[in-house]
């Protein structure tokens, strides 16, 4: 009985220990996580059985943005309240990766860093603090950085204290995978090294491994590397053979694999650097890549005699190694160097090194050069109707390439820190500074590429919108010029033109919102241009609508439809203006080529500007009535200007008919010189307030109010003074007037009597008489 009870208690304790110790994941066997490997279907953790499963839809592959990762977490875990994501601290080995269109696969194994899907309110991780270790934390409320930044901060802090980073976790979330602090545990070097198994320490003794095969040829591991590479190659061959067998069984899948998109092949190729499998390189290619690298001393200043393979000479040559960083063309002895690189033909090495090699100690992934650059490919391809889809693909490839480069740099950083453990503190700081500069340069390069991508996309969208608007306006004018004009055809052309103008306005506002979020200073500079463009749209639409009055018969017949159209557009303008500040986050992938606002409900925000705002400035027209058109018995229509009175100086060629109308004349609108300086907009409390432009008409009322205010203030002051004076005069203490001719003794006696003094003699005689 007792052994059975002990087994039950042990099983219950084991299940309890497997549960994730977070409030949001209470009762779950595993923590919600997702993993991505470009070219393969995404994987997610089954929280009920703790196993990795493929994408349920069978279509989702690697995601390029943090917003997309959060959305995918919410899709695969609909029963959980996923509020944020964070990159995991440690990589995991996941099997059974599948390509698109396959539900079950085997022998596909990759090592990746997953993303944790955080449930409910954020709760910091519970870190274990071993003996002789210290728990530390850092918070900065003015900083909102990624998981990678805070990991670097924790490592630097522990390194300054001559300790190793044992574990860490994020604090104070401020965005998607962004935080304001970090908690971490630093352990002494001796304690950390004792707690790690010696076999594991030879492979990787750092706290975080960023994936990838960390091959060190300088440590005499040639046989191990070649053996591992051969095993991987055999596994890949078997994997491809198994897939070929499956393809033979299903002819449709053969066609699908043969017609695999170029983009998917590119993503699969560029993901090699983040895994431990060599899916496209043979052992010879790996060795050729190593032996073709130039000798790198590294950022440290040690003088260690090493050997490297010289491509031009075809033999190994000595050089001095600094002790950290560098590359893999680094061998202890000449014999070992020749054993690795001597078997590779010099012609293949010269072919590999025909292009200039980077001089930087941090070697970026070489697989990116095998495919065209994502941004360059997008920029070289002319725009078409699928501009938005091409832009989204280019953006995802750019983010994937940036993540790949950052992962490679972090692996190099880890390797350099392992090698620099026994070096002086100055050398350690030099290593940290070098890689910090490298990370910053990669971030800046990615930011420049993003900006170039966005600017090109915006320019193409604007050109396409201009073409659409021009074509719609020409069709509208042609319909008006038809003999006889068909009212319903005219209305359809007018509706298309209005939609084209609406797209232009939507594109302008979204572009300004993106610039405002990325670069507020630049947004302030282009603010007047944005307002001017909105004003141009307003003027252009008023002129186009005024043309309808030249054909009164058509205007009268379609008046109801036009009024309804104008009301819808006015409601659209009100919705846009009312929601300008309600949702400030807009990805730079949204643009005017996406579905209209009535379908997507995307909101924008305008910065407050100096000056006055008129609601009509963003409402492109005013409703009109055909009854206001005067009758003309001679069929000569006097056009009615539907624009505001202040803007009626623009000529519309009254009475000239529509035979000589040109689209360019409508598109070119004269703007007031003052509008560039005073944009005429003001936002208060998320509402738009109209101020009359003609302030002179209210000067009389203002002067009257000022005079009345002065009079009222004067009366109040006089009243207060009188009340104060009355208060002081009403207070008295029974003062009795004394004749000025009396003697000083009598005056003194009078004052004493006023204060209650009684002459004792008088009091004695009064008592005697009584």
Swiss-Prot record:
Output this protein's name. Answer: Amyloid-beta precursor protein
Cite the position(s) of the site with description Required for Cu(2+) reduction. 170
Q: So where does Zn(2+) 2 get bound? A: 677, 685
Q: Where is this region: Zinc-binding?
A: 181-188
In which tissues does this protein get expressed?
A: Expressed in the brain. In the brain, non-L-APP isoforms are expressed in neurons, isoform APP695 being the predominant form. In astrocytes and microglial cells, almost 50% is L-isoform (appican).
Q: In its keyword annotation, does this UniProt entry include Ubl conjugation?
A: yes
Q: Can you list the disulfide-bonded cysteine pairs?
A: 38-62, 73-117, 98-105, 133-187, 144-174, 158-186, 291-341, 300-324, 316-337
What stretches pass through the bilayer? 702-722
Q: What else is known?
A: Chelation of metal ions, notably copper, iron and zinc, can induce histidine-bridging between amyloid-beta molecules resulting in amyloid-beta-metal aggregates. Rat and mouse amyloid-beta peptides have an arginine residue substituted for the bridging histidine residue and are thus less capable of forming amyloid aggregates. Extracellular zinc-binding increases binding of heparin to APP and inhibits collagen-binding.
Phosphothreonine sites (modified residues):
729, 743
Annotated stretches, region: Interaction with PSEN1: 695-722
Q: Which gene encodes it?
A: App
Q: Where is this region: Required for the interaction with KIF5B and for anterograde transport in axons?
A: 756-770
For the site labelled Reactive bond, the residues are: 301-302
Membrane topology, as annotated: Single-pass type I membrane protein
- Assigned protein family: Belongs to the APP family.
Biased amino acid composition, Acidic residues: 196-207, 228-264
Q: One GO molecular-function annotation for this sequence?
A: apolipoprotein binding
Q: What is the effect of changing residue 762 to A?
A: Some DBB1 binding
Please indicate the ranges of residues that lie on the Cytoplasmic side.
723-770
Where is the short sequence motif OX-2 located?
Answer: 344-365
Q: Where is the BPTI/Kunitz inhibitor domain?
A: 291-341
Q: Where is this region: Heparin-binding?
A: 391-423, 491-522
């Amino acid at each position: 009985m007792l052994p059975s009870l002990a087994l039950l208690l042990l099983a219950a304790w084991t299940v309890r220990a497997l549960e994730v110790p977070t409030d949001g994941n209470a009762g779950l066997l595993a923590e919600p996580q997702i993993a991505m490997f470009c070219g393969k279907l995404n994987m997610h953790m089954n929280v009920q059985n703790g196993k990795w499963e493929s994408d349920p839809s069978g279509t989702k592959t690697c995601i390029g943005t943090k917003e997309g990762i959060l959305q995918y977490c919410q899709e695969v875990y609909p029963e959980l309240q996923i509020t944020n994501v964070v990159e995991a601290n440690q990589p995991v080995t996941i099997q059974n990766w599948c390509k698109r269109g396959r539900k079950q696969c085997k022998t596909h194994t990759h090592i990746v860093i997953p993303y944790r899907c955080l449930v409910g309110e954020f709760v910091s991780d519970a870190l274990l603090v071993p003996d002789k270790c210290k728990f530390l934390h850092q918070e900065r409320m003015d900083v909102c950085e990624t998981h990678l930044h805070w990991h670097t901060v924790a490592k630097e802090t522990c390194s300054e204290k001559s300790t190793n980073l044992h574990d860490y976790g994020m604090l104070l979330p401020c965005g998607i995978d962004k935080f304001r602090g970090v908690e971490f545990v630093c352990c002494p070097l001796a304690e950390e090294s004792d707690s790690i198994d010696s076999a594991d320490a030879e492979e990787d003794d750092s706290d975080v491994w960023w994936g990838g095969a960390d091959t060190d040829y300088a440590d005499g591991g040639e046989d191990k590397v070649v053996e591992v590479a051969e095993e991987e190659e055999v596994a890949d061959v078997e994997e491809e053979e198994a897939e070929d067998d499956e393809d033979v069984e299903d002819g449709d899948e053969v066609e699908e694999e043969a017609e695999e998109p170029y983009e998917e092949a590119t993503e699969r190729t560029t993901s090699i650097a983040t895994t431990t499998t060599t899916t496209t390189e043979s052992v010879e290619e790996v060795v050729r890549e190593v032996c073709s690298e130039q000798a790198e001393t590294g950022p440290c200043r040690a003088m260690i005699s090493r050997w490297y393979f010289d491509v031009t000479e075809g033999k190994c040559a000595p050089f001095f190694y600094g002790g950290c960083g560098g590359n893999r063309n680094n061998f202890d002895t000449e014999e070992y160097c020749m054993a690795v690189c001597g078997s590779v033909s010099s012609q293949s090495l010269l072919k590999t090194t025909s292009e200039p090699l980077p001089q930087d100690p941090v070697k970026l992934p070489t697989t990116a050069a095998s495919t065209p650059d994502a941004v360059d490919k997008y920029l070289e391809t002319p725009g078409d109707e699928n501009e938005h889809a091409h832009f989204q693909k280019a953006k995802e490839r750019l983010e994937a390439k940036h993540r790949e480069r950052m992962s490679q740099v972090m692996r190099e950083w880890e390797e350099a820190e392992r090698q620099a453990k026994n070096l002086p503190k100055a050398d350690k700081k030099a290593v940290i500074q070098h890689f910090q500069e490298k990370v910053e340069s990669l971030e800046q390069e990615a930011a420049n590429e993003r900006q170039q991508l966005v600017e090109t996309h915006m320019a193409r969208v604007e050109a396409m919108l201009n073409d659409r608007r021009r074509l719609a306006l020409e069709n509208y004018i042609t319909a008006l010029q038809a003999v006889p004009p068909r009212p319903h055809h005219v209305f359809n052309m007018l509706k298309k033109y209005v939609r084209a103008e609406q797209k232009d306005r939507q594109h302008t506002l979204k572009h300004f919102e993106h610039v405002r979020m990325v670069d507020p200073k630049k947004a302030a500079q282009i603010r007047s241009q944005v307002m001017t463009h909105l004003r141009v749209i307003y003027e252009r639409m008023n002129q186009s609508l005024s043309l309808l009055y030249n054909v009164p018969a058509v205007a009268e017949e379609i008046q109801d439809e036009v009024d309804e159209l104008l009301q819808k557009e006015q409601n659209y303008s009100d919705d846009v203006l009312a929601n300008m500040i309600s949702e400030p986050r807009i990805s730079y992938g949204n643009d005017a080529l996406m579905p209209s606002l009535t379908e997507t409900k995307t909101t924008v925000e305008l910065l407050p500007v100096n000056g006055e705002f008129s609601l009509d400035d963003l409402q492109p027209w005013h409703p009109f009535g055909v009854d206001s058109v005067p009758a003309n018995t001679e069929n000569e229509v006097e056009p009615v200007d539907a624009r505001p009175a202040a803007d009626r100086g623009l000529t519309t060629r009254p009475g000239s008919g529509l035979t000589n109308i040109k689209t360019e004349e409508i598109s070119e609108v004269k703007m007031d010189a003052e509008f560039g300086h005073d944009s005429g907009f003001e936002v208060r409390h998320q509402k738009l307030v109209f101020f009359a432009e003609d302030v002179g008409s209210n000067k009389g009322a203002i002067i009257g109010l000022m005079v009345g205010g002065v009079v009222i203030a004067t009366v109040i002051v006089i009243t207060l003074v009188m009340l104060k004076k009355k208060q002081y005069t009403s207070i008295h203490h029974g003062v009795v007037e004394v004749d000025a001719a009396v003697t000083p003794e009598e005056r003194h006696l009078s004052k004493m009597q006023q204060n209650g003094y009684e002459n004792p003699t008088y009091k004695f005689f009064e008592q005697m008489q009584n």
